[in-house]
Curated annotation (Swiss-Prot):
This is Methylenetetrahydrofolate reductase (NADPH). The modification Phosphothreonine is found at residues 33, 93, 450. NAD(+) binds at residues 62-67, 93-94. It holds the Pfam family MTHFR_C. Pathway: One-carbon metabolism; tetrahydrofolate interconversion. Disulfide bonds: none annotated. Residues 11-35 have a biased composition (Low complexity). It catalyses: (6S)-5-methyl-5,6,7,8-tetrahydrofolate + NADP(+) = (6R)-5,10-methylene-5,6,7,8-tetrahydrofolate + NADPH + H(+). GO terms for molecular function: FAD binding; methylenetetrahydrofolate reductase (NAD(P)H) activity; methylenetetrahydrofolate reductase (NADPH) activity. Allosterically regulated by S-adenosylmethionine (SAM). It comes from Bos taurus. The lineage of its organism: Eukaryota, Metazoa, Chordata, Craniata, Vertebrata.
Length: 655
């Protein structure tokens, strides 16, 4: 361990003046080495080709923008849950009535951008040319490119009234839109178009519709997604007809698991499809029983998909979810396409933005708030690759709005109060909230604490390796918000701590990050003198007054992996400079997400305010990863010192 030298040349802790991460400049130094996972840099069509060449089947999911801000929060949560099953891509529909190209949180553009940037999903944005000028469409495409979207589903769109009216200076057909994309943007976008297995409802004939489809492909479309259908033979005839007229690109069948009588009627009305009589005969008698219809819909979809997959004509399945998850996930599980335990390319959640696809290093502080980290680094032109580098001023943007919908807690205020306490009576009340979050046991009101302001997701699997120790220290006022155990050469396939390619080994230094009182910090600093050559620490208050024994600009790698034929990868670091940016956010969350649940000047609000104003944020790293984790002993020694009579404490300080 390297420490900042004192004036006499010996190592020791260093006090820093008040500072805030927001005061640093935007200049940064970054190193670039080959990425860990080449697949992250593949285009969607390249991913499709690789899977088709290997015979691996895939699935994809369609969603539509919500109508409300809370609906947007719920949809992003659904992206995270359904993204865990391993879709090759998702697509987001274009709703002309919902101002789809705007910056509204319910717009198609923002929802698709969020799926890419904050949920790490390969995403296709629908775009229609109906009632839009050439300039408007070009503007939408430029905006999509800027936001990191690389895939477009080009559609004509539906007329607002009953009759189609040509747009002066616009486009009249999806073919025109595909040509425009290729003329203006070259090969930047992968382009998908729609196919109609029974012909477009407004088409002259099935043959004429196929001719238009071939024109769309010839104009530059890369693949086709079909409208929904209910019988496999419908798709087989369509694919055969496509092949006969020279369409050779992938054709993905659109699958709609029937989930309710009214939703089926509405979808059939919009798509102008005819439901087969045998399906009507089953549904009509049970039309008022949603559970029975959903169960039938699952069985029907599984049977249809099995027939499609068995044909050898289907490389993947595209599901129309209607923003629901239960039926689609059940179908995918029965087909064996849902990934129950996805392998993690890196220890943290990825972004699918093209400029972040070589990113493979992040500070550990945002481990439980990856969307916040992505938001605060969205203006970076380059991202750390290979190592964090020796940067004196990483350009973290300020997090002024804690209620951006993709950063907002998934739980409404009423649920948060039930979890965190409708009334707090003391600091110990807060300690109990942290303890209940770790234990998973209901609190005194009978509610489970499933989240905290610093962690809106389920606890990481590796937390189970330290659960008893974490519970013990949280009950005594060491309020942990981030931690990891030490790991010495576990296989990369390990179900709890594994990440990266097969055949590798992963390593971790023990890490502990927590809030605690001034009294505890004073005792901790006395104890840390015994661990000076082993434990790095950084302690800071809300004003930025901080003490550390880590050299100012030296990041400490706390997670790394060794893989066959590759350089060592170190995806997680403890960086003292970044910690000062993180502390602003970490302290603010006390007030923004917890304190503001209560009335101003109320006892509960004042307790949270007191913790915000007086507690310290601490991080500890045990550098001796091959040995038993010493951080628990550090904390136990601190508690033991706190329990001594004042005279004994003074004698200890004098040693």
């Amino acid at each position: 361990m390297v420490n900042e030298p004192r004036g006499n040349g010996s190592p020791g802790p260093r006090w820093e003046g008040s500072s805030s991460g927001s005061e640093s400049s935007r200049t940064s130094s970054r190193c670039s080495t080959p990425g860990l996972d080449p697949e992250r840099c593949e285009r969607l069509r390249e991913k499709m080709k690789r899977k088709m060449d290997s015979g691996d089947k895939w699935f994809s999911l369609e969603f539509f923008p919500p109508r409300t801000a809370q609906g947007a929060v719920n949809l992003i949560s659904r992206f995270d849950r359904m993204g865990a099953g391993g879709p090759l891509f998702v697509d987001v529909t274009w709703h002309p009535a919902g101002d789809p190209g705007s910056d509204k949180e319910t717009s198609s553009m923002v929802i698709a951008s969020t799926a890419v940037n904050y949920c790490g999903l390969e995403t296709i944005l629908h775009m229609t040319c109906c009632h839009q000028s050439r300039e408007e469409i070009t503007g939408h495409l430029n905006k999509a490119k800027q936001l990191g979207l690389k895939n477009i589903l080009a559609l004509r769109g539906d007329p607002i009234g009953d009759q189609w009216e040509e747009e002066e200076g616009g486009f009249n057909y999806a073919t025109d839109l595909v040509k425009h994309i290729r003329n203006e943007f070259g090969d930047y976008f992968d382009v998908c178009v729609a196919g109609y297995p029974k012909g477009h409802p407004e088409g002259e004939s099935f043959e004429a519709d196929l001719k238009h489809l071939k024109e769309k492909v010839a104009a530059g479309a890369d693949f086709i997604i079909t409208q929904l259908f209910f019988e496999a033979e419908t798709f087989f005839r369509f694919v055969k007809a496509c092949s006969e007229i020279g369409i050779t690109c992938p054709v993905l069948p659109g699958i709609f698991p029937i989930q309710g009588y009214h939703s089926l009627r509405q979808l059939v009305k919009l798509s102008k499809l005819e439901v087969p009589q045998q399906i009507k005969d089953v549904i009509e008698p049970i039309k008022d029983n949603d559970a029975a219809i959903r169960n039938y819909g699952i069985e029907q979809a599984v049977s249809l998909c099995q027939e499609l997959l068995a044909s050898g004509l289907v490389p993947g399945l595209h599901f129309y979810t209607l923003n629901r998850e239960v039926a689609t996930i059940e179908v995918l599980k029965r087909l064996g396409l849902w990934i129950e335990d996805p392998r993690r390319p890196l220890p943290w959640a990825l972004s699918a933005h093209p400029k972040r696809r070589v990113e493979d290093v992040r500070p550990i502080f945002w481990a439980s708030r990856p969307k916040s980290y992505i938001y605060r680094t969205q203006e970076w032109d380059e991202f750390p690759n290979g190592r964090w580098g020796n940067s004196s001023s990483p350009a973290f943007g300020e997090l002024k709005d804690y209620y951006l919908f993709y950063l907002k807690s998934k739980s409404p205020k009423e649920e948060l109060l039930k979890m965190w306490g409708e009334e707090l009576t003391s600091e110990e009340s807060v300690f109990q909230v942290f303890a209940h979050h770790l234990s998973g046991e209901p609190n005194q009101n009978g509610y489970k604490v499933t989240c905290l302001p610093w962690n809106d997701e389920p606890l990481a699997a590796e937390t189970s390796l330290m659960k008893e120790e974490l519970l013990r220290v949280n009950r005594r006022g060491i309020l942990t918000i981030n931690s990891q155990p030490n790991i010495n050469g576990k296989p990369s396939s390990d179900p709890i701590v594994g990440w990266g390619p097969s055949g590798g080994y992963v390593f971790q230094k023990a890490y502990l990050e927590f809030f605690t009182s001034r009294e505890t910090v004073e005792a901790l600093l006395q104890v840390l003198k015994k661990y000076e050559l082993r434990v790095n620490y950084h302690i800071v208050d809300v004003k930025g007054e901080n003490i550390t024994n880590a050299p100012e600009l030296q990041p400490n790698a706390v997670t790394w992996g060794i893989f066959p034929g590759r350089e060592i990868i170190q995806p997680t670091v403890v960086d003292p400079v970044s910690f000062m940016f993180w502390k602003d956010e970490a302290f603010a969350l006390w007030i923004e997400q917890w304190g503001k649940l209560y009335e101003e000047e109320s006892p509960s609000r004042m307790i949270i305010q007191y913790i915000h104003d007086n507690y310290f944020l601490v991080n500890l790293v045990d550098n001796e990863f091959p040995l038993d984790n010493c951080l628990w002993q550090v904390v136990e020694d601190t508690f033991e010192l706190l329990s001594r009579p004042p005279q004994d404490k003074r004698e200890t300080e004098a040693l």
